[in-house]
Amino acid sequence: MTYRISQFLTISVFLAVLSPSMASDWSEWRGPARDGISLEKDLPVKWSPAGENLAWKAPYGGRSTPIVMNNRVFLQNTAGKGELEQERVMAFDADTGKLLWEHRFNIFLSDVPPHRVGWASPVGDQATGNVYALGVGGSLLALTREGKVIWERSLGEDFGLLTTHGGRTVSPIIDGDLLIISGITFAWGPHARGAHRFMAFDKRTGETIWQSAPGGRPYDTTYAPPIIVNINGTRLLIQGASDGVVHAIKAQTGEPVWKYEISKRGINTGVVVHGTTAILTHSEENIASSEMGMVVAVDASAKGELKKENVKWSVYGWQGGFSSPVIDGDRFYHIDNGANIAAFEVATGKRLWLENLGTIQRASPVLADGKLYVGTENGKFYILKPSATGVEVLDQDQLGTEADPEEIIASAAVSNGRIYFVSDANLYCIGKKTSGVTNQGPPVEGLPNPNRPATHVQVFPTELMLKPGDTARFRVRLFDEYGKFIREEANATWSLDALKGTVANGQFVAASDGGLQAGSVKATVGNVSGAATVRIYPPLPWTENFDAMAANTVPPLWVNATLKFIVRDFEGSKILVKTTEGSSLLSRARAYFGPSDFSNYTVEADVRATTKRRQQGDAGVIAQRYVLTIYGNSQLLNLEPWQPETARTVSKPFAWKPDTWYRMKLQVENLPDGKTRARGKVWAVGEAEPAAWMIERIDPIPNRQGAPGIFGNALAEVFFDNLKVYANK
């Protein structure tokens, strides 16, 4: 019917049972079951910023939901101003609000502006006490309970994760031993196609366990929270993505199960599930209607691409594209973009009632103790008592003033009898000053069955970068048709594809004379196979003039180059071209061609600009997360680690003539005092290299490592040739 409106994965067990000390934690954005529901009781019905039921307030704002774990509150936000601005994770005592520690980390090689830093929420791992964060620039970090770095990955350099002006970043989640994130990536080889890609990492080591790209062409970056549910024995991760599709994949393997296309734009709201009914929402263009926005219920037990017969009901014209819904028995509540909250029947989609809360809405409501806790972007925080016939406002408080409100963009967290939430100015804790454990944990999976037939072979780590002569150890896990772990397999048959070296019993030894190469390590168990991809980079120096490559191809090991750069014949030789074709997601691009742990090196390249409709493109070289860029239209030479934050950019005029080759040179050096020096020069090809550096920056918050690369912004085509990368002398 249609209405219209104007696992814990180890060898021995799959998921660990939650202990009572863990049971009151709110360790992820959407809570213990990732559905915005808390089972706690005796929660506050009113409070006041002036003091009533205010346990504490801390002067730290944010735009993402705080999490609570082991009596600590963790918040991700921005720190510092201007050239010293960074992203950070903060830890507070949950009883007092005392700041315990903070860890700051750099933003680099990203188009995200400063005011959108701290978009994602951190996630806590109840088994280890560790905390994980995905920054707006693509840095993925694992921190101990005390804020010490365990491991760090650069997803932009390693996988081509796209970060844009919108800042939208998906919050990570934990499932057993896996840390799972997603986003738009343009990687290399088998993963080069631009897509919304799900990626799982070993939470203890940071090794890549699986990658999955079940969708089509992405429209824009998104931040929809995933939910993991058991549907007829299959543990599904369900999430809206950047291709306008809601995808259901097996949580422990990434194998696609079903998908449903609902929009011509990316999806930012979370899915909620009641039995085998999944409720999906958005506020953008529809596929089957000219109206904007919809709510739709689909059969979550279906397989493949969902069709009309898999749709239980749909409501067109409801524009709830930021706030996620929450289920309350046989009804659910949802807030549209204009801060109108409505109740709908789960079974039919019939709207039961509607109430206005403000004018702008981003935060998702939390259902706890029969009440809804939610803030609005207008600075009002509500405690509501919903029913089948309407909603009672138990309490509403204005934070800041109506003229100058404290904006509330993030959702609340419920833990130990208290409500935690953040505005753009403060972190609040309301409720009892002393806590009590009353919540329950999510459902627990049973033990694996080692005798079930295997339908999926998982080779891990599934992505590695090595040097010639290196040795790597791979392992194999088997899963059944439901995506459940069976056992770790020691008797797989191993083989190599396009790699020089040897492999036996899971141990791969790269040929010492193999040079630059890429391929896969394959494991077969019975008639089922799986593989891991490997890139092998020889020691510096490197040179590349593209002459050995076929025209209309992409350098095979380059990250974030497909559909953005292409090899072309030009004046009797080969060059690399930053093309102008494609969407806005393709026009600006940073391509990487080496490991992200390189340091103390120099990058050189020839560049040449063209003009089109009186526009001239931009070109740059990248070393250790610094970019030396010539801007065509503005005729400037810039040295910058994070282009939108202009206080750290060094700039000088530079006359860049079109249709003329220039040589660019960027050197980055880690200094003994802990700072980093980046310096560059540019000169016309055929002229002598200038003795002096033209531009320099000493960075007080240095990037101490990073991949070599190039940058192109194709207002008109930009050419590259004769690349060199070598260690500093």
Question: Where would I find each of the regions flagged by the language model?
Answer:
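Flexible glycan-contacting loops in extracellular carbohydrate-active proteins
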Residues: 689-719
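Extracellular carbohydrate-recognition regions
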Residues: 24-28, 533-561
